[in-house]
């Protein structure tokens, strides 16, 4: 399967790529699959299973399904209008399928969250049914992480032929040696199979623009995050504090943490974010990119493009041979993957060799092994927001540590990813985005 950098970095809304973006896309896909049968539909029923059913209310999965059935997309929905759109459906008991065909919709009956039932293929399963006089269509979808959705027959694979295909770190390094180019160049050449260079660069700078706007929004807003935990936003106050204390020798790392907090507070509030590679870990790559732009002499837009291409290459390997889904392998697959991608991107723009870049990514994966996904209240707030700040700081340190070496190291990226996958398989389900273990049961919700 060919994976583009734009598959890994997609514009969406918070708070979760697997639990918000994925269900919204699945619901819209179901409506599109109705085709000419759409006018015959009298009722639609959606059932969410596994992690989606267990933590879906906290992650906004219910709202996402309503929006997707209404024809909205994560990329284009007006985040400011979402509460009103959802409230209108709930208060009227009516839903306009695909924005074209109005039906009755009783949420208590027609949107079922199964907290302790799972489908066999993946923890994040969904079944949609449409009825006229009889059943018109039934489809099963799985939200497999990062906003990716696959159907019951598997992923609809992109069969694009790439000039330099790779699925492992070893293959990627071999390509770099054969071609005598950095990792970003290998990824760029593959991207040219889909679109011209100018479009690739413009698209990545558009991604960067959304990231920077997300940070700005996070720095401007304060108050309490939605959901009932009464978690207060901290980014705005911390920003003011850092501006008033410019002489602190450790301020660079404080800024990194600040940028991550800003993004993840926006994500927790349902704002516009970029999956990087997931929403739960969306603050790490923007934070490290902001570090590059603010603190690295000679930083440029061209460097941002190289950073994102390099991070994307590592993301391809992680998605193909590991996992970026907290419901599959715990938070090691989300924050761990984002840390690895950010560390690799930073190492390249700081002048690292392909071997040093791969080393930076490996450090990012290795030192998140075993990390659980145990969101308190099923919300992407505790421990998720702070965890992004720590993950971003670790990414900077991983890049710097790799650059102080020559690229040779005992544990390869491929071995670290294999270990992540195996650790995730051994991890109890209660530690994989179900809110039934860890902090989620030891912290009392207020």
Residue ranges and their predicted role:
Residues 299, 310, 317-389, 401-410:
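Hydrophobic alpha-helical bundle architecture
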Residues 410-446:
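Extended hydrophobic packing segments that form well-structured cores
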Residues 42-56, 88-95, 236, 307-320, ...:
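Short, mixed-charge aromatic SLiMs
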Residues 198-330, 438-446:
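Accessory "access/gating" subregions that flank catalytic or transport cores
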Residues 18-35, 286-298, 343-351:
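Alpha-helical support elements that line or immediately flank enzyme active sites
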Residues 1-14, 36:
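An N-terminal structural lobe/cap that precedes and organizes the functional/catalytic core
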Residues 74-246:
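C-terminal regulatory domains involved in ligand/effector binding and gene-expression control
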Residues 9-27, 268-288, 331-340:
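Conserved phosphate/anionic-ligand binding catalytic regions in large, soluble enzymes, centered on
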